[in-house]
């Protein structure tokens, strides 16, 4: 069974975690919520705090070796917190080093900037972080979903059906020879 890590903390955009998690589980994959803290993490939806989700593993209990792919949901607070967590950045970098699929949506690519893995990559994101990605060396496009050698990105919750579909496709393909950290 394929195991997928969904890296998140308090303030993640609820639909950007729930929708991919549900799609992955419907495919028969195990989708673990990985977070810096144990217990529960609280989502953000429609401008307010929303539902809490159980953390399956803490970041210090796992490594990229334990998983087949990584998903990075957005939200404004979630990536802003994760991008300052050294263990989270190492975890993200290791997926790239191992050439495993990585998917990020909305503000999720901010974590990838801090992990220093976007230079030379083609991707999309929420429009407000476009300049940050370009300044970090990425090639940014305003499209619903971009796939760059196992690296899947989307702009916002409206793109989730296409994002989920491409994510599953990349997981089924596995490692990518051209994926680089």
Could you tell me what each predicted segment is?
Residues 1-98, 102, 111-122, 130-181:
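Extended, subdomain-level signal for the structured scaffold at the beginning of enzyme domains
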Residues 105-107:
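Short, thiol/selenol-centered motifs that function as redox-active sites or metal-ligating centers
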């Amino acid at each position: 069974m394929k195991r997928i890590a969904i890296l998140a903390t308090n303030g993640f955009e609820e639909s950007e975690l729930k929708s991919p998690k549900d799609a992955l589980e419907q495919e028969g994959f195990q989708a673990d919520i990985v977070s810096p803290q144990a217990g529960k993490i609280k989502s953000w939806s429609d401008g307010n705090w929303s539902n809490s989700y159980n953390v399956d593993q803490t970041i210090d209990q796992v490594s990229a070796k334990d998983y087949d792919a990584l998903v990075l949901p957005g939200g404004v607070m979630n990536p802003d917190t994760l991008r300052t967590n050294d263990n989270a950045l190492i975890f993200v970098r290791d997926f790239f080093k191992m050439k495993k699929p990585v998917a990020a949506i909305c503000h999720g690519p901010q974590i990838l900037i801090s992990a220093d893995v976007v230079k030379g990559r083609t991707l999309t994101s929420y429009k407000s972080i476009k300049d940050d990605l370009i300044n970090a060396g990425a090639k940014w496009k305003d499209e619903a979903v971009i796939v760059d050698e196992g690296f899947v990105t989307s702009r916002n919750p409206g793109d989730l059906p296409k994002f989920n579909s491409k994510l599953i496709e990349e997981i089924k393909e596995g490692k990518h020879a051209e994926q680089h950290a």
